[in-house]
Amino acid sequence: MRDIHEEILQRLFALQDLEYQTFQSKLIPGISPESMIGVRTPALRAYAKELSRRADVDAFLAALPHRYFDENQLHAFLISLGKDYHLTVEAVDTFLPYVDNWATCDQLSPGIFRKHRVELIGEIWRWMASEHTYSIRFGIGMLMQHYLDGAFDPSYPERVAALRSGEYYVNMMIAWYFATALAKQYDAALPYLEQRKLDAWTHNKAIQKAVESYRITAEQKECLKKLKIKK
């Protein structure tokens, strides 16, 4: 009888799309094309739902590190389907050190977190305090996803603005956070740009992404353009 890991690899290769593999490898720097099988995201999501109903799926989740990028994507989707909050946080903590690219990081989005925002915020600060690039990025992403609407607190952007990193994928997420904050909490987010609380690159990138957004008014866009730091 085959173990689940062998079965999963066979299924992933059966779902392989070589044209997509070539396309995808160009989007994710630092990941070797040989580690990409080339499974499209909808197929991975569907397979994750199928696997999530199996009692032996934990054997796959425990088999870290995975060899293939697609296994990591599948792993992220499986965690995202978790129904128990505390077990899901544990699964995230186990997996994050092995996340080595923006795509897997950004696909990791547990639905159960929506029901546990009171407890989640402490975990977010912990992830943001990590020295691991994608743990920090994940923490900022969760803050952006869950705390810019009804659960927003004006002190939260200060925690993001205080971050300093030499990592492109951390700074890009900080910019994305503030661009989204400008769309959802404009009056609270604007002072961070007016007072130049971000480093110059992240400041300008946040403005660029905000100006590109359909959720920002024309008047707001004109205001933001004037705040760009000239080189």
Label each PLM-derived region with a short phrase.
Residues 1-231:
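Alpha-helical scaffold domains
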